[in-house]
């Protein structure tokens, strides 16, 4: 809960007075809003409580909690005409307190800014690996590595270029130091994308190119880009009998995870993800656009039934500096689903049939400006371990997550600064690197991680 509003409507025998109390919680050092603070306001004769995840008789709307009181109970106001109340607030990693406040019913709005001090910050000791340089996986005097992916059988897929990625990109497939495939991409290449089956595709402006095995030879085939993102990309992972879907699109701050049973074709929703603050800003953009844009959005609403605020948010607010796509990745490990619900500060653990096992509070993403936390969780597909990436002053740190506690149990600092395209496979970190101010092509390196049971 970044902000909450308390509307107090007090009535007396002869007059009716209203008062708005605006309370915000911020970090005392960074001045950033603190999400998911649990609050309770108490009067002498009644008490109101609310938290972001558990509400009792109160409405949670767009990241704000509204209390509505209409009461003539005695004890709410003093003889001086002031209202007195006790405010209790708590947070797992910030100081908790219970304070007494009193204010007069003269102004329409009273602002109360509370600055909390972090009391429980997770400290992880960096693990310094041997000073030897990482091993070189791919080096060429002709080609630079723009992107790469690792296949399940150990095959290495490289998107390389000689001078310009947009003009002379090639897809290479290397297995056990042998180049199995090398072919020019006929369109402007953008990046490599892996699908739920582990197949690697080259993303271009209009198509997705992938390798197809025909008569023991590899051939480059293409499918329409819109087909890939409509029917293939939504499948996040699969178990023996289920496919796990995501309705995520980067221009909407909410989506849903669900599972499709391949035996009886039944679909079950697993978890709805939403960034409440971003959703409120997203929808409120409609209030500030010009009349022409509002009419355009209303016409679309009449045609499709989709709210006009969503059309404006998707086409206007997502292009602003304030919009951040919601981040809440799902991973399948040992027949268990792990959903990192960052908007709610929770790690949700599910069975593959969609039954919630537990919710674990997580805070390793807090103070991102100081810690360098990147929205880039990765799973080692060989070991099943999940890692989070941090970046500070050009140095990249790889943090191992404990799936039982949600804590980062170790951090490993990579040997080089300003590395690109970090991937983790078989307990090793792969990355693209070129020395600063060097004429060397971009090479692919790997650095071994310390072995630790998770």
Role assignments for model-derived ranges:
Residues 183-190, 226-230, 361-374, 405-425:
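Conserved blade-ending motifs and adjacent loop-strand segments that build the rim/top face
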Residues 79-101:
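A short, solvent-exposed loop/turn motif at the edges and junctions
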Residues 21-27, 114, 127-129:
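A short, amphipathic beta-strand motif
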Residues 134-170, 184-191, 322-337:
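Beta-strand-rich domains and repeat architectures in extracellular enzymes and scaffolds
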Residues 92, 115-137, 143:
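Short, acidic, small-residue-rich periplasmic hinge/interaction motif at the N-terminus
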Residues 164-172, 207-213, 250-261, 290-294, ...:
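Structural motif
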Residues 29-46:
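Short, ordered, surface-exposed loop/turn motifs in non-cytosolic proteins
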Residues 47-71:
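Short, acidic Ser/Thr/Gly-rich low-complexity loop/linker segments typical of extracellular
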């Amino acid at each position: 809960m970044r902000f909450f509003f308390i509307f107090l409507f007090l009535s007396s025998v002869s007059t009716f007075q209203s008062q708005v109390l605006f309370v915000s919680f911020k970090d005392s050092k960074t001045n950033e809003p603190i999400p998911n603070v649990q609050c309770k306001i108490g009067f002498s004769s009644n008490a109101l409580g609310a938290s972001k995840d558990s509400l009792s008789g109160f409405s949670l709307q767009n990241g704000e909690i509204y209390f509505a009181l209409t009461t003539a109970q005695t004890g709410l106001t003093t003889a001086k005409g002031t209202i007195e109340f006790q405010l209790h607030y708590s947070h797992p990693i910030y100081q908790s307190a219970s304070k007494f406040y009193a204010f007069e019913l003269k102004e329409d709005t009273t602002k109360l800014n509370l600055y909390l001090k972090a009391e429980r910050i997770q400290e992880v000791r960096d693990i310094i690996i041997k000073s030897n340089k990482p091993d070189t996986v791919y080096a060429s005097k002709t080609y630079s590595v723009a992107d790469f992916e690792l296949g399940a059988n150990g095959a290495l897929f490289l998107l390389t270029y000689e001078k310009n990625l947009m003009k002379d990109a090639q897809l290479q497939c290397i297995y056990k130091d042998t180049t199995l495939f090398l072919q020019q991409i006929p369109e402007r290449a953008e990046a490599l994308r892996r699908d739920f089956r582990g197949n690697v595709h080259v993303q271009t402006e209009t198509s997705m190119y992938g390798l197809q095995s025909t008569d023991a030879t590899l051939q480059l085939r293409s499918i329409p880009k819109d087909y890939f993102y409509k029917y293939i990309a939504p499948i996040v992972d699969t178990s023996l009998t289920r496919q796990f879907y995501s309705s995520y699109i980067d221009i909407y701050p909410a989506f849903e995870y669900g599972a499709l049973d391949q035996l009886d074709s039944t679909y079950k929703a697993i978890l709805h993800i939403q960034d409440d603050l971003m959703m409120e800003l997203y929808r409120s953009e409609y209030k500030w656009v010009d009349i022409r844009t509002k009419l355009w959005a209303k016409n679309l609403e009449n045609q499709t039934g989709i709210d006009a605020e969503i059309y404006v948010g998707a086409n206007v607010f997502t292009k602003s500096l304030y919009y951040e796509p919601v981040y809440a990745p799902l991973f399948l490990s040992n027949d268990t689903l792990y959903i990192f619900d960052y908007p709610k500060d929770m790690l949700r653990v599910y069975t593959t049939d969609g039954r919630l096992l537990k919710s674990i509070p997580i805070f390793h993403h807090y103070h991102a400006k100081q810690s360098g936390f990147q929205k880039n969780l990765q799973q080692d597909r060989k070991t099943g371990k999940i890692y989070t990436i941090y970046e500070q002053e050009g140095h990249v740190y790889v943090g191992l997550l404990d799936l039982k506690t949600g804590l980062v149990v170790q951090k490993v600092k990579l040997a080089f600064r300003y590395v690109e395209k970090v991937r983790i496979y078989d307990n090793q970190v792969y990355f693209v690197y070129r020395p600063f101010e060097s004429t060397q092509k971009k090479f692919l390196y790997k650095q071994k991680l310390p072995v630790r049971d998770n």
